[in-house]
Swiss-Prot record:
Its main location: nucleus. It comes from Arabidopsis thaliana. Residues 20-37 have a biased composition (Low complexity). The lineage of its organism: Eukaryota, Viridiplantae, Streptophyta, Embryophyta, Tracheophyta. Residues 60-69 have a biased composition (Basic and acidic residues). This is Zinc finger CCCH domain-containing protein 2. Plants lacking SOM germinate in darkness, independently of various light regimens.
Amino acid sequence: MDVVCTEHQMRKPTVEIPPRKLLLSSKSFPSDSSSPRSPRKHNWNKSNKITSEHEEDNEDNNRENKEYCYDSDSDDPYASDHFRMFEFKIRRCTRSRSHDWTDCPFAHPGEKARRRDPRRFQYSGEVCPEFRRGGDCSRGDDCEFAHGVFECWLHPIRYRTEACKDGKHCKRKVCFFAHSPRQLRVLPPENVSGVSASPSPAAKNPCCLFCSSSPTSTLLGNLSHLSRSPSLSPPMSPANKAAAFSRLRNRAASAVSAAAAAGSMNYKDVLSELVNSLDSMSLAEALQASSSSPVTTPVSAAAAAFASSCGLSNQRLHLQQQQPSSPLQFALSPSTPSYLTNSPQANFFSDDFTPRRRQMNDFTAMTAVRENTNIEDGSCGDPDLGWVNDLLT
């Protein structure tokens, strides 16, 4: 019986059928001449193309270099700023098979790197103190602070706002810092301070935009959206000397804010409104505060000159609105102090108009203003040197 079975197996030998992938690879690619009986091993990639092991190794190396390259955001969509800030470890992973979570840019159940969507949850880029101490927060997703490193440094107000210390030699898969000037993100001032971007009255009125663009403008006043930084503001004088001028500046700022709230006034209307407000206010408080000490006599003189110049500037503004523009308006400076006197303006092309005479008129006008101010303040122009004679005798 055994002999019959052996003969039957010898007549019909068994044949081992290779897998389907090897059959397809052997039909598509002929075997090499060096090894005709050993077909080459091939694998299927995601694009359903047959590649050899050597080509697959090259692709893996290129992919690894691409992931570790510091400037890979230009080619990799998963490395863009928008994906890193709003999708990285937020969107749930849809892959069914098991894989390495550290290499996957999507979120997985129970993963510590999971983040909250900053578009849905309002939290800042600061680390939660409770989460830092115990690794957990009692407020959960309602906490206003960041939980973990990913929420902290991938927040839109912190991601790539600082330079990486390793620079172009950085080998991190996910780096939170910038490696080139092109990657560095510069945030607007309202985002840096944590205030949401909202249309302000300054964005509607071009005059307020011009005023706010100057860091030393006195039209800023106490407006919240036009406030100057402390580093740019000059040192404040004592309160008893500058109280009246601070109120004057607040009055001017309120006039500008009222004109900005209207929205329909142009630059000339805002300027005329500002001059009218300065002309109507009284500087008696400023003169009273400055007359308390003889040292503040120049302050009172400047206040009187400022009041008279505001009134005459207002008159010039009305005359310019009534009369057509002429080349003589631009020949003379509008801020010249010669308008403080009641003398008629000299013609630019006449013989009476000379620089020497103009300087003398300016000096005479300023001397008259200084003498009038000294008389009003009750202070003497000449210093009292009687105590010097007492010391000499």
